[in-house]
Design a protein with these regions (language model features):
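Transmembrane alpha-helices
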Residues: 1-5, 85-98, 176, 180, ...
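Interhelical loop and adjacent transmembrane-helix boundary motif
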Residues: 4, 10-47, 76-79, 108-132, ...
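Membrane-interfacial helix termini and adjacent extracytoplasmic/periplasmic loops
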Residues: 10-15, 68-73, 107, 111-120, ...
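C-terminal transmembrane helix and the adjacent membrane-cytosol boundary/short C-terminal tail
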Residues: 36-77, 157-159, 229-240, 244, ...
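Transmembrane alpha-helix signature in integral membrane proteins
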Residues: 41-56, 128-159, 166-169, 250
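Cytoplasmic-entry segments and transmembrane alpha-helices of multi-pass inner-membrane transporters
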Residues: 75-86, 154-189
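Amphipathic cytosolic juxtamembrane alpha-helices at the membrane-cytosol interface
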Residues: 80, 163-169, 211, 225, ...
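Loop-to-helix entry region at the N-terminal start of transmembrane alpha-helices
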Residues: 83, 88, 129-141, 179, ...
Length: 373
């Protein structure tokens, strides 16, 4: 589903190969019509793939009999070496573009042309020219994340503890944004709120930061819902029943007992939602304006201009942030083995170096706003 709905990759390196998201975007921008028809076709195909996958998953289930567990067999050194070579080879090929991206960000540039030597000038230009985009990449997804956590916690509780036809419908509808391409969702938001809700003039939010916040919240809600549902399913209802039998209200039980116990699932889903919010382009490219553009939009526009140094610097910053948040998510869910002291200290140093420009940028932005006032 992620590959089907991806916009940035085929748009930048797809050349003559157009995918559904790219086709929908070009049709919408050119105003020749047809984008709605292509959007409906994309939704039908995505929904069909999702239903087929769900049918196969429900039909075929596998379990292991504890009475006859699988016995491990010794593998020859040649097979072990082949497995390691294959796995690490795939990882190296996957990471190689990122390594070259970091290398490109430190190349010395003269205008838009790379020259001999190395320099951090691309990063200076990125912070000077794209400071607002970097600030928006934190500010807008952070507000959206608060909404995602609130709605995901509430919906997951209804889906697990209050199961009925209505809550099942809400749970199913909350997964729709996951299968819908981002360009389709962006066009839907523009069509719905360009002249207000149903053309009434109420909620004319197209071109504002609020429509970006809404789109990011709706688009990334399924990640946190599924993580929260999985966490809540591991909590016995008898714990809540015991609290209520001792005089605690349902709201108090939910706030002080249930929510803290499912906090690890909420945090894991929230960080995953955050990483996808700051790194996705498909919805933002349709809904942004000059004041609300994010780093992904800035990277896209810099690549189109041929300014690869600044684009590489912004991409490197975004990559480091994504790795940090993803690692924190794995640590919070207990999926990551504790690192040695030296590696842990190095990790703290990497976080400090990567986040320090962001905090200085926030102070700079606040100072500029105070001066304007």
């Amino acid at each position: 589903m992620r590959a089907f709905s991806d916009f940035g990759t085929p748009m930048l390196i797809g050349e003559g190969y157009r995918t559904f998201p790219v086709l929908i975007y070009t049709q919408f921008i050119s105003e020749v019509g047809g984008n709605s028809a292509f959007a409906i076709m994309a939704i039908i195909i995505a929904l069909a793939i999702f239903l087929i996958q769900k049918h196969i998953a429900n039909r075929y289930s596998f379990s292991m009999n504890l009475l006859h567990p699988i016995e491990p067999k010794k593998t020859t050194k040649g097979k072990i070496a082949a497995i390691y070579a294959t796995v690490y080879g795939i990882i190296f090929i996957s990471v190689l573009p990122q390594i070259y991206l970091i290398y490109t960000s430190f190349l010395k540039t003269s205008g838009m042309v790379s020259v001999k030597g190395y320099s951090p000038n691309s990063y200076k230009l990125a912070f000077n020219r794209m400071g607002s985009a970097i600030f928006n990449t934190i500010r807008i997804p952070l507000i959206a994340l608060v909404l995602v956590v609130l709605f995901a916690t509430f919906i997951s509780y209804l889906a697990v503890r209050k199961r009925n036809l209505f809550t099942n419908l809400i749970d199913s509808l909350s997964m729709v944004p996951y299968i819908v391409p981002g360009t389709v969702l962006g066009i839907a938001f523009i069509s719905s709120f360009n002249t207000g809700l149903f053309g009434s003039g109420f909620l004319m939010i197209t071109g504002t930061a609020f429509i970006l916040i809404m789109s990011l919240s709706v688009r990334r809600l399924p990640y946190t819902i599924r993580s929260s549902v999985a966490s809540l399913q591991q909590i016995a209802p008898s714990i809540e029943e015991a609290a209520e039998s001792l005089g605690s209200s349902r709201l108090n039980t939910f706030a002080k007992i249930t929510t803290p116990m499912m906090l690890s699932g909420i945090i894991s889903g929230a960080i995953l939602s955050w990483v996808t919010m700051i790194s996705k382009l498909s919805t933002s490219i349709l809904l942004y304006n000059v004041k609300t553009r994010t780093m992904t939009v800035a990277i896209y526009t810099e690549v189109l201009r041929g300014n690869y140094g600044v684009a590489a610097a912004l991409s490197t910053i975004l990559t480091v942030w994504s790795i940090i948040y993803q690692k924190e998510s794995m640590m919070s869910s207990g999926k990551l083995v504790t690192m040695p002291k030296l590696a842990d200290r190095m990790w703290v140093l990497v976080k400090a170096i990567s986040l320090s420009p962001f905090f200085s940028l926030i102070i700079q932005q606040i100072g500029l706003k105070i001066k304007k006032r």
